[in-house]
A protein has these predicted regions:
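Predominantly flavin-linked oxidoreductase catalytic cores and closely associated redox partners
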Residues: 1-105, 113-115, 121-132
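Fold-independent oxyanion-binding glycine-rich loops
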Residues: 5-7, 48-50, 60, 69, ...
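Short, function-defining helix-loop hinge/capping sites that tune catalysis or transport
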Residues: 14-15, 175, 181, 216
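Residues in and immediately flanking transmembrane alpha helices
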Residues: 19, 180, 186, 234-235
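A general structural signal for well-ordered alpha-helical segments in protein cores
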Residues: 26, 81, 162, 217-220, ...
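Short flexible/disordered coil segments
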Residues: 37-42, 46, 129-132, 136, ...
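FAD/FMN-dependent oxidoreductases across multiple families
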Residues: 74-193, 199-201
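C-terminal helical "tail/cap" subdomain of flavin- and related membrane-associated enzymes
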Residues: 192-276
Length: 276
C-alpha cells in the first residue's frame, strides 16, 4: 500500500496521477517578520491591485507571517515582491500611525513602489521601518495546487493499492489556496476506507464529501478575480459587504469555511432580502 501526502511537488503524484500544468499551480511566498512594537497585530487580507491573488498578514505567537499567493503562470517575482514589501511597510506604518495608508500611491495602482516610495513624513516612516525589517525577516515559499474544473472530473487520486492526500492530490481551495482542512479530511476518509478493507472506495468518498465544493470553487475563481460593474469584483464585494449586513455575514462565513461554494448563491439571495 502506497500513500503519498508529500505536498504539491509530490513526485509520487506526478508518477501516478500525472503532472499538473503551471496554470493549475499557485505560488505562495513571503516573510516571517517580528511582531510590531505595539500590542496591536491584526490579521489583514488585502486583494492585490492589478493582480490575481491576495496578500496576507497572519500574526503568530512570536512573529507575523506575511505572504502573497498568485497563479504560477502569471507569477513575476520582482514586482510581486515589491508589492509585498509595500504591503508589509504599510502594515507596520499603521501600527505606529493609524492614519498611515496601507498601500503607497504606486502600490495602490499595483505597481512597484521601489521600496518605501513617495515622499514626506510617510516616506520617512516607511524608510525607517524597511531598514529594521530588512535585517530581521526570514523568507519562505511554497507551491499550492489550484485545479481547473475539468481536471477534477478526470484526475484520479486513488486506486486498489495507492492514494494521494492533501496537496499531493490537488486538494486546495482554488479561490483562497486553503488546504489544511482538505488535507485532514482526505486523511480521515482514507483511514476509514483502509480500516474497512475497501481502499478503492477512497476515490468515491472524497468526491462525495468535498469534491463538488472544490470544483464549484474552481468554476468561480475566474469570476472572483474578474470585474463587476466597472471595478474588480473583490472591490465591489467589499463595498456591498460594508453596506449590507446579510452579504457581510455570508462573506465572513465563506472565508471562515462555514459557508460552502455550492449553496452560496442561494444564501446571498435569501440574505439580501432578509439580512438576519
Amino acid at each position: 500500500m502506497l500513500v503519498a501526502a508529500d505536498g504539491a511537488n509530490s513526485p509520487v503524484a506526478r508518477r501516478l496521477a500525472g503532472a499538473l500544468p503551471n496554470s493549475e499551480m499557485e505560488v505562495a511566498f513571503g516573510y516571517r517578520a517580528p511582531l510590531p512594537k505595539s500590542a496591536d497585530a491584526p490579521t489583514v487580507i488585502a486583494f492585490l491591485p492589478g493582480w490575481v491573488g491576495y496578500a496576507w498578514a497572519f500574526p503568530r505567537l512570536d512573529h507575523v507571517s506575511f505572504g502573497i499567493a498568485t497563479t504560477q503562470d502569471a507569477f513575476e517575482h520582482r514586482p510581486l515582491d515589491a508589492l509585498l514589501w509595500d504591503f508589509m511597510l504599510g502594515y507596520y506604518a499603521q501600527r505606529e500611525d493609524p492614519r498611515a495608508p496601507l498601500w503607497s500611491p504606486a502600490g495602490a495602482r499595483g505597481e512597484s513602489a521601489g521600496g518605501h516610495g513617495g515622499g514626506g513624513a510617510g516616506h520617512d516612516l516607511r524608510a525607517s521601518i524597511e531598514l529594521r525589517l530588512r535585517e530581521s525577516v526570514e523568507r519562505y515559499a511554497a507551491r499550492i495546487p489550484g485545479l481547473a474544473p475539468e481536471t477534477f472530473d478526470t484526475r484520479r487520486v486513488g486506486g486498489d493499492d495507492w492514494a494521494l492526500l492533501g496537496d499531493a492530490a490537488g486538494f486546495a481551495d482554488p479561490v483562497t489556496g486553503e488546504g489544511i482542512y482538505y488535507a485532514l479530511r482526505s486523511a480521515e476518509l482514507f483511514a476509514d476506507c483502509y480500516l474497512a478493507g475497501r481502499v478503492a472506495d477512497y476515490e468515491r468518498r472524497w468526491r462525495a464529501d468535498f469534491g463538488r465544493e472544490l470544483q464549484r470553487a474552481s468554476r468561480m475563481r475566474r469570476r472572483f478575480y474578474g470585474h463587476f460593474v466597472g471595478a474588480p469584483f473583490t472591490s465591489r464585494m467589499i463595498d456591498f459587504a460594508r453596506l449590507h449586513p446579510g452579504i457581510r455575514r455570508t462573506l465572513r462565513e465563506l472565508v471562515a469555511g462555514d459557508q460552502g461554494y455550492v449553496g452560496v448563491k442561494r444564501t446571498l439571495a435569501l440574505r439580501a432580502l432578509w439580512p438576519r
